[in-house]
């Protein structure tokens, strides 16, 4: 299921590039030339907690690395599949893309071979960004991004449409 979700997410993020109303033509050209997307995490800290792994332990770091590697590999596999279907990003050069010293050069051999043969749809695929608001709004209060929960409960201040601040209690649901 994780693999399928990643493939769906990469396809959706690639589709967003095509339907975005870019404010400037220069922005559209840049987006189309590189087709950068940013698949990332929310709730990793809570996932580790639900697996009964303390965030600051070797076991938790090993699990986080395993999850991250699976997400990375499936995202690159999905983008290579999209390249076969829709074409590689216009600036793609396989030798340069897979050369030593960059992120793609550290991919597993089978993925590098797939990219050599099919190309890759998106120049960049992963983004580990802060996801506080997204975690609260769309992930039922999951922990932010790759971070552990800083508190099981806290108060969040939100500016309302009339300009006033209102406080809301927030509870991490993985607890």
Question: Could you tell me what each predicted segment is?
Answer:
Residues 1-175:
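Long, C-terminal-biased catalytic regions of enzyme "large/alpha" subunits
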